[in-house]
A protein has these predicted regions:
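Short, low-complexity N-terminal intrinsically disordered segments enriched in polar/charged residues
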Residues: 3-4, 12, 20-47
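Second-shell loop/turn segments in exported
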Residues: 25-26, 37-40, 55-60, 110-112
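Short solvent-exposed beta->alpha transition segments
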Residues: 33-35, 49-102
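Exposed beta-sheet edge and beta->alpha loop/turn motif
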Residues: 90-141
Length: 141
């Protein structure tokens, strides 16, 4: 009887731990997706300076504002305006190749651009030291 009670107690503790961890990751993922959508709205509106200013320190240390403006306009201009964007997935992680340890969410959107339908945008917000999600990477495939 004691063994059964102990096993049930351990399973319940384990299940509560998984649920809490999953719920915390879901909250972080949701906040990061919101931040990514807001940032993408700036890029969609060609507010490149503002998007650079709102990006993560890691991003800004790698790309100057002038380089960002040139890079993003050269990538976005040929694909045209966004016609639709649908969230495909978001994955929380604490490590990324080439990035500092921290909290990241790798987000993918299926995006239909006017001149490049069926594209995949990958955007990676990271949490800064003040708890704000800021974009640290952006790619279109």
């Amino acid at each position: 009887m004691k063994t059964t009670t102990l096993i049930k107690s351990l399973l319940l503790t384990y299940a509560v731990g998984i649920f809490t961890t999953t719920a915390q990751a879901d909250e972080k993922t949701e906040a990061a997706v919101t931040a990514a959508k807001e940032w993408l709205a700036q890029v969609d509106a060609k507010e490149y300076k503002k998007s650079w200013q709102e990006a993560a320190r890691f991003f800004k240390d790698k790309v100057t504002e002038a380089n960002w403006n040139e890079m993003v306009s050269s990538v976005r201009k040929p694909v045209g305006e966004v016609k639709s964007r649908e969230l495909v997935g978001a994955q929380f992680t604490t490590t990324l190749p080439g990035g500092p340890e921290g909290e990241y969410v790798v987000i993918q959107f299926k995006t239909n651009f006017a001149d490049k339908p069926d594209s995949v945008e990958t955007i990676t917000p990271m949490k800064d030291d003040k708890g704000t999600w800021r974009v640290s990477g952006y790619f279109i495939k």
